[in-house]
A protein has these predicted regions:
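N-terminal low-complexity, intrinsically disordered segments
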Residues: 1, 8-28, 189-195, 228-236
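Cysteine-nucleophile protease catalytic domains, especially the papain-like/related folds used
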Residues: 6-119
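Structured loops at beta-to-helix junctions and adjacent beta-edge loops in soluble globular domains
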Residues: 16, 45, 141, 175-177
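Short loop/turn segments at secondary-structure transitions that flank enzyme active sites
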Residues: 19, 48-53, 144, 163-166, ...
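Extended, compositionally biased low-complexity polar/Lys-Gly-rich tracts
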Residues: 83-106, 136, 157, 172, ...
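Active-site-adjacent substructure of cysteine-protease-like catalytic cores
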Residues: 115-173
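Cys-His-centered catalytic/binding microenvironment captured across papain-like cysteine peptidases
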Residues: 148-154, 163-237
Length: 237
């Protein structure tokens, strides 16, 4: 299959979505008004990115500056709504997504040692997929409990290649929805997922390295993903 290139398939805006889950009054009509929101659509952005890859079309080139003062397309915009739909598919509203969501819950409650061992198995699965030319979605685990409210710290990225660095360490090249592609930059897009250099950090043995920042993770797994063809108004957004 053709290579996945961030300049073609990484979105040009960050994962700064706010999802309006529910709003209303408690008690109804006469009570105080409440709003429940969640932050981010990393899974939707990762899934949508791969959808465009499988379609052999670049993602829409809309960028942060197009939506000022916001930094992302608003609700009602074709691309925003498609990403939201794919966010739900990634964890909730498809049987593959349910499996992903359940694995996030289960793995979040594992001991550091058990989670690390399972993540090593997932490293091998990821390498095998990439050797076949198949980019994949990786679920990054940071939560330390199986509570639903704890799951917001977990994350989803696209793994599109791997390499061995000068120290012999395996590194995955990823598209991180939190790190948008900047078409105006002369620097190559580079975000790396690898085992942490500090061997004593048993609690957080993986690190995601992006420009100016390193995030630490408990482990990761290869997610279930199935391509979907976006509607024409999404492709042309």
């Amino acid at each position: 299959m053709r290579p996945y290139k961030p300049e073609d398939y990484a979105f040009r805006f960050p994962n700064a979505f706010v999802n309006q889950v529910w709003s209303g009054r408690i008690p109804p009509r006469i009570g105080r008004e409440y709003k429940i929101t969640t932050s981010g659509r990393c899974g939707g952005m990762a899934f949508a990115s791969l959808d465009f890859y499988h379609l052999a079309l670049p993602v829409p080139t809309v960028k942060t500056q197009d939506f000022a003062p916001a930094s992302v397309p608003p609700d009602g915009h074709p691309l925003s709504d498609y990403i939201y739909t794919r966010q739900l598919h990634s964890m909730l509203t498809s049987w593959r997504g349910v499996l992903n969501g359940l694995r996030f819950l289960h793995w979040s409650g594992l001991s550091p040692q058990r989670l690390h061992q399972k993540s090593l198995d997932e490293e091998r699965k990821a390498v095998e997929s990439l050797d076949r030319g198949r980019p994949l979605v990786l679920g990054l685990v940071k939560a330390t409990s199986r509570g639903l409210t704890a799951q917001g710290v977990n994350h989803q990225v696209v793994g599109y290649d791997y390499r061995t660095n000068e120290s012999g360490q395996l590194e995955f090249l990823v598209y991180d929805p939190n790190e948008p592609f900047d078409a105006s930059s002369n620097e190559a897009y580079q975000v790396i997922l690898r085992r942490a250099v500090d061997p004593d950090n048993a609690e957080l043995p993986y690190e995601l390295i992006r420009p100016g920042r390193i995030d630490q993770w408990r482990g990761f797994f290869v997610q279930h993903y199935r391509p979907r063809v976006p509607a024409e108004h999404v492709i042309n957004a």
